[in-house]
Every structure is written in C-alpha cells, then in structure tokens.
C-alpha cells in the first residue's frame, strides 16, 4: 500500500504578525492552504478548508481520492459560508488549497490558487500543479515569460480560490486529477511564501540532496534568508510502499493556523437551513 512518509514546517515569516497558512501531513494526505492575502480572516479560511479536507480523507482513507477530495472541498466551501454567517466581519475570506491524497494505490492532486505541488523523480524536480494567477494566465497566453513571473508587480493576484463570496461558480472549482506516481517519488507541497522567496534551482537542489526533515528545515530557512516577506509552509513527503513505516507515522501533523482550533469554523454551531 502506498503511503506518504515525511514532515512539514510552517513559519510566520519576518514581516507578518500572524500565520494565515494551514497544513496537514499524514500517511494518506499532504495539504497546504494559504489564506489569500488582504482578505479578512485568512487564517480561518485556510484552517477550515484544511480541517474539512483532512477530516474527510481520514474518514475515507481507502475510497477513491478523486471523489473524496471533490466532496471534501465542496464541504469546505459550505463551512466557509457558515463562518461568514457566524461573523459577518469574515466576509471576503478566502484560501488556496493544494492537496495530495492516496488510497494506497494511486495519488490524486486537488489544487486551487497559487500554493504548489512538485514531484521529484530521478533527481529532477517538476511542478505538477498549475497556478491560478493572473501572471500564470499571462504566461499561458505568451504575453510574458515564465522567468519574469517572480518579479512581476501582479504576481500575487489569485484568480481562483475557495471563498464564501458571490461570483462565478467556476472560480471555486479545483483542478483534480490522478498523478503518474510510483513508490520512491518525493513530493514538495508549499505556499507561495517559499516560491516567491527562493529560486526554483535552489528549491530543486535542497529537495534533491537532503532527507525529508532536513530539506523541510532548509527550505524554510532559505525563504527567511530571502526576505521572509510572507508566511512560509513546506511539506516534503516520500511515497513509499511500506506498511511498517505507515504504522509508525501516526495520524497526522497539524501546522500553522490549523494548530489553533479557534481558527476552524465548527460545522455544528450553525443550523443548516
């Protein structure tokens, strides 16, 4: 049975006064959510989305992760709406979400926003998620080069996220697809607090030359050394076919805003209509 084995870390950074990133790492799920900058209660949005997806996948560890992730994300959006109903000052809260889930046989990616997932195989690091940002759309259309993205003035404009506001339903739809994954692969899941601060070549070098724990620590430190202008969250997990390792991995690691239960909207505190 395929399972994830690795670790994660989340740091508030050197500029922000609180952490709006939330993450969860377990043998069956590696997830990062980043409260969208400037929106009210970003930490509530990210922690709630992370909690709902983690709880749902934990309850159905051997079911089709395509279905489980899709259902979980829809439930997360419902809870974001509940959060606004409980506290109207949260109106406008939103979050990215990038999650890798396995049922023991395959790995599925669910992604919305600009947090990222990467695959390391045979020493080569490649991105398996596609940013839902204005600058990525400009790259896709050929209007700017990929090399110019990190310094573009509009690089932080997110076009799709999970939110509780009005708007086009398509803006809430994540990309969900099965990855070509095999035992021995390594995955990096991270918030843009890493990728905005650290060049891709440096990220690839760290991920490919360290064990998971050291790579996680060194990636966070590299983001801080690069300026630490945002919260930074990093998960480095290896995909292994090793039941004994899975048993030793525990139920999961909670990181960032997810560590504070006050950030999670309680789905039982508001009656369904």
Q: Where in the sequence are the language-model features?
A:
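PP2C/PPM-type serine/threonine phosphatase catalytic domain
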Residues: 1-273
